[in-house]
C-alpha cells in the first residue's frame, strides 16, 4: 500500500474486548465494566454508571479518547521542564490504565521509527498496551498523518485528552489543529515535557489561548467518573491507589 493511502477501517469483536484497527493504529478498549459484587440495579441501586453532568462542563469517561504521541527514548532523554521524565512516564502509564479500565479508546503514535531516526515507544508505556499496533509517522505534526487522523476519527469522540513529547512540538501542533477542527482538547500538563521550561510554558500558553483545557493526570482521571459510588469508581480506585504508591517511589 502506498504510504499516503489510508487503509479501510475495520472492526473486530472479540469476547469482552473490542479492538478497532485504523490503518497501522490500534485503539485499545478494556473489558466491559463489571458491576461490583453485591450491587443491585434499578431505583435506589448503590452502584450505577456515572452519567454526564447536566451542564457538560466537566468531562465524562464515555465521551473521550486518549491520544499519546512520541513517548520515545530520545524525547524522554531531553526533557528539561518542570515535570521530570520519571513522573511523565508514570503519569502516562496511569492515564493508560485509567483509559483501559473505563473503556476509553487509546491512539498511540511514534515519529521516525521506520526511518531509523528514533527508537520505539519506551517499554514501560508500550507494555501497558500489549499487542497494540503503533502508528509511526514522518511528520512532527500527527494531525497531518492520514493514518493517525483516521484512527482519531474512528473513535467517534469529540473530546480528546492528548499527551506528547515534546510539549512545544509534537503536542502543540496536533492540539491547535484539532481545536481548529472543532474538537475539545484537554492537555495533560504533567504527562508532557519540553526541551526547556521556557519552551514548555510558552507552548502551554499557546495551546490554552487556542482553546485547550490544561489539566493534570490525576485531576483529569477523577473528573471522568467523579462519584465514588459509581461503577467506574470501583475499577478506577485500585489504579489510583497504585499510582499514589508509585508516586512516592519517585518523589
Q: Which sequence ranges carry the predicted segments?
A:
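A short glycine-rich beta-strand->turn/loop micro-motif centered on a GG-aromatic cluster
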Residues: 161-164, 183-197
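Conserved, surface-exposed functional patches that form binding/active-site neighborhoods
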Residues: 173-183, 198-205
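N-terminal secretory signal peptides
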Residues: 1-14, 22-31
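Internal catalytic-core helix/loop-beta-alpha segment
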Residues: 137-176, 180
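Residue-level signal for short, function-critical loop segments
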Residues: 110-112, 166, 191
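Active-site acidic carboxylates
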Residues: 36-138, 154, 187, 201-208, ...
Amino acid at each position: 500500500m502506498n504510504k499516503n493511502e489510508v487503509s479501510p477501517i475495520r472492526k473486530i469483536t472479540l469476547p469482552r474486548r473490542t479492538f478497532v484497527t485504523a490503518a497501522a493504529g490500534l485503539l485499545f478498549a478494556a473489558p466491559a465494566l463489571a458491576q461490583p459484587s453485591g450491587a443491585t440495579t434499578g431505583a435506589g441501586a448503590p452502584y450505577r454508571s456515572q452519567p454526564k453532568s447536566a451542564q457538560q462542563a466537566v468531562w465524562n469517561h464515555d465521551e473521550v479518547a486518549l491520544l499519546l504521541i512520541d513517548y520515545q527514548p530520545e524525547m524522554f532523554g531531553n526533557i528539561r521542564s518542570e515535570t521530570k521524565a520519571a513522573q511523565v512516564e508514570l503519569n502516562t502509564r496511569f492515564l493508560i490504565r485509567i483509559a483501559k479500565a473505563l473503556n476509553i479508546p487509546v491512539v498511540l503514535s511514534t515519529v521516525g521509527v521506520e526511518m531509523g531516526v528514533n527508537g520505539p515507544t519506551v517499554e514501560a508505556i508500550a507494555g501497558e498496551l500489549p499487542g497494540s499496533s503503533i502508528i509511526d509517522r514522518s511528520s512532527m505534526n500527527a494531525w497531518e498523518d492520514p493514518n493517525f487522523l483516521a484512527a482519531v476519527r474512528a473513535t467517534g469522540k469529540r473530546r480528546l485528552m492528548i499527551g506528547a513529547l515534546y510539549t512545544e512540538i509534537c503536542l502543540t501542533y496536533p492540539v491547535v489543529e484539532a481545536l481548529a477542527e472543532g474538537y475539545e482538547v484537554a492537555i495533560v500538563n504533567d504527562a508532557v515535557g519540553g526541551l526547556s521550561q521556557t519552551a514548555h510554558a510558552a507552548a502551554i500558553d499557546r495551546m490554552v489561548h487556542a482553546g485547550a483545557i490544561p489539566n493534570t493526570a490525576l485531576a483529569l482521571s477523577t473528573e471522568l467518573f467523579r462519584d465514588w459510588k459509581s461503577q467506574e469508581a470501583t475499577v478506577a480506585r485500585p489504579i489510583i491507589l497504585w499510582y499514589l504508591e508509585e508516586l512516592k517511589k519517585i518523589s
